[in-house]
Amino acid sequence: MTAPSAYPLKFQAGARTLLSVHRRLIRCTFDLAMARETRPPILASLDSADGYMLRSLPQSLLDGLDRSNLLVHVRQYYVRYFADFGGGFEAYMASFSGKTRATLKRKLKRFSDDADGRVEARMYRTPEEIAEFVRLAIPLSQNSYQHKLLGAGLPADAAAQNAMRTLAAADQLRAFLLFKNGRPVAYLYLPVAAGILIYAYLGYDSAEAKLSPGTVLQLEAIRMLAEEGRYTILDFTEGEGEHKRLFSTGGIACADVLMLRPTLANRLLLGAMRSFDDVIDRTKRLSGTQGFAWLKSLRR
């Protein structure tokens, strides 16, 4: 758990934050090992803090959570996906349905057909290799959908690059690039925590989106990781998505839980957040309708 600090409680639609209200919160983000726990967490004393923010709390632990008369709001429910390829790449592929395997093979072939018959992916892990990865990946990231639309591209500042080299020196990082005709078109960045690969950054050249370069690189990365055998569990972290579901071998039902002191201001804040989150959830379910088009328009 972190020390109490100002934390923005966001009213967010898609990638756009419409409003932020700050509270001093003690934060706890559950990693994959913690998410597999069967006992509710022991929360630190609030002292001067306004409350807690618990991310990736297993839903099975919600009922046993010590609420201590606090106001509780679940901001989102989701499955925390992971992939285990410790049995080798062939066993990993065999865990999928025939339809999924056919889909992946079709995407590989489509990319290969448009890249002179090759699927060229490279793994980077030493400090020297990571320096080369950064040189190639940063310009690619800045042209990616993830950077342009979501603001979630690969960090390019000096501190982030120093952290990458430090992780690589400790053998705590795996990074990948996918090339098309000698040009990088997708990147994947996986730091390691407690022996588990963390799905941190995936991006691709938006001009190549029709070739599914992110999917192709993810599959090739898992192939290389399974062959290496050093790290064989990939944590897709909090939040859902078709990409995560596609490559996962399992998942844990989790929730992001906000707990606040029962003040009038906090009651009004949580009431507004519940109403807003409900509208966003219902709008998301209207996929393909006018309501969903409204949500997408906020992301442009």
Region annotations inferred by a language model:
Residues 48-57, 225-237:
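Conserved GNAT acetyl-CoA-binding A-motif
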Residues 182, 214, 218-221, 234, ...:
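Hydrophobic, well-ordered secondary-structure elements that form the walls
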Residues 30-37, 54-60:
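Structural motif
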Residues 2-16, 21, 69-90, 232-287, ...:
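Active-site/acyl-donor-binding loops of N-acyltransferases
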